[in-house]
Regions:
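A short, flexible beta-alpha/helix-coil linker loop
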Residues: 11-15, 112, 180-183
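Canonical Radical SAM [4Fe-4S] cluster-binding loop centered on the CxxxCxxC motif
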Residues: 1-24
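Radical SAM/AdoMet-radical enzyme domain recognition
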Residues: 28-47, 56-178
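Cysteine-centered iron-sulfur cluster-binding motifs in ferredoxin-type domains/subunits
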Residues: 1-2, 52, 243
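Flexible mid-to-C-terminal extensions adjoining Fe-S/redox cofactors in radical SAM and related proteins
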Residues: 260-281
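Radical SAM enzyme [4Fe-4S]-AdoMet core and its adjacent flexible, acidic
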Residues: 116-128, 135, 139-242, 248, ...
Length: 281
C-alpha cells in the first residue's frame, strides 16, 4: 500500500540509511534474549509494526514465537501486531488465534476516505480487501482493534466515522492525529487543534448517546481521560505530557526510544551488542 500521509516513509527519508529490509535472525534472536533477560517472572509484550510487518512473511513469525517459547522460563508473554490488513488470509488468522495475538488494523473509517488516503501501490482502492481481512479475523476469534489516522478530512465528518463504527460493529478504536512532517511543512492532511477538538466533541456526544442505549464502544482517548479522572495511569503515550518508557528496535538492530524518533540523532544503541539496562534512558 502507498498511504498518502505515511509517517514511516517520512522518518526513513530523514535517516542516512533507509531501513527497508526484513529483520534477520541475528536481530530477532537478540531481541528475544535481551527481553527475556529482564527478569525470569516478567510480563513481556512483543509488538510488531512497520512499515507493514506481514511483509516479513508468516515463517518469520512462526520462527520468532517458537524461539520465545523455547527460551522463556516463567515469563508471561503477550503478542500484538499492527497491520494494514491487506495480506490477511486464512493462515494468518489461524496463526494469530493460536498464539493469542492482539491485532490492530489500520482503517480510515468510511470507504471513500479510506480509499483516497490508503490506496495500493497501483493507486487502486483497498477498503473492501482490508475489511474482508477484519471480518475474517473476527470470525476466527482473533481480538481486533481498529486504528484510524485522524486527518483534517476525517475530522470534518465525525458522524460518518461513528456510522462506520456502528455499521461494522467496531468494539475498540483509536485515532492517531495526523501531524505535519518532520520538516514541519503543513500539508493537506495534517490536523490543527481546532479540528481535533471539534471532532472529539461531536464524537463524544455520539458515543455518549450510544452508551446511554447500553452499547459500549471503546474509544482510546475517552478511556484514557477517564483513567486519569479516576487517578489511574493512562495507557496512551503522551497523555501526561511526557514519553512513556519503551524501546523500539528497527530491522537492522538499531534501538530508539520511540517510533516517532527513530532517527539517526536519537539512536541509543544496537540490540545485538547492548543490553536493555545499558540503554535505559
Amino acid at each position: 500500500m502507498r498511504c498518502r500521509y505515511c509517517f514511516y516513509c517520512d522518518v526513513a527519508a530523514h535517516r542516512e540509511e533507509r531501513s527497508a529490509r526484513v529483520m534477520g535472525e541475528d536481530v530477532a534472536s537478540a531481541i528475544i534474549d535481551r527481553a527475556l533477560a529482564v527478569a525470569s517472572d516478567a510480563h513481556i509484550s512483543f509488538a510488531f509494526q512497520g512499515g507493514e510487518p506481514t511483509l516479513a512473511g508468516l515463517d518469520f513469525f512462526h520462527s520468532f514465537v517458537a524461539r520465545v517459547e523455547e527460551r522463556r522460563e516463567n515469563q508471561r508473554v503477550s503478542w500484538a501486531l499492527q497491520t494494514n490488513g491487506y495480506l490477511i488470509e486464512e493462515e494468518w488468522a489461524e496463526f494469530f488465534r493460536e498464539h493469542g495475538f492482539l491485532i490492530g488494523v489500520s482503517v480510515d473509517a468510511y470507504r471513500d476516505l479510506h480509499d483516497s488516503m490508503r490506496p495500493d501501490a497501483h493507486g487502486a482502492a483497498t477498503y473492501a480487501r482490508v475489511m474482508s481481512g477484519v471480518r475474517l479475523l473476527r470470525e476466527r476469534g482473533v481480538d481486533v482493534n481498529i486504528l484510524s489516522v485522524l486527518t483534517s478530512q476525517m475530522a470534518a465528518h465525525p458522524q460518518r466515522v461513528f456510522s462506520f463504527i456502528k455499521q461494522e460493529k467496531i468494539t475498540h478504536i483509536q485515532f492517531i492525529p495526523c501531524l505535519p512532517g518532520l520538516d514541519d511543512e503543513r500539508d493537506t492532511f495534517s490536523l490543527d487543534p481546532r479540528a481535533f477538538s471539534s471532532f472529539y466533541r461531536r464524537l463524544f456526544d455520539l458515543w455518549w448517546r450510544e452508551l446511554g442505549a447500553g452499547r459500549y464502544v471503546s474509544i482510546w482517548l475517552f478511556e484514557n481521560v477517564m483513567q486519569m479522572a479516576l487517578g489511574q495511569f493512562p495507557s496512551q503515550c503522551g497523555m501526561l505530557g511526557r514519553c512513556a518508557p519503551q524501546f523500539v528496535v528497527e530491522s537492522d538492530g538499531s534501538v530508539y526510544p520511540c517510533d516517532f524518533y527513530a532517527l539517526d540523532e536519537y539512536r541509543v544503541g544496537d540490540i545485538r551488542v547492548d543490553s536493555l539496562e545499558a540503554r535505559r534512558l
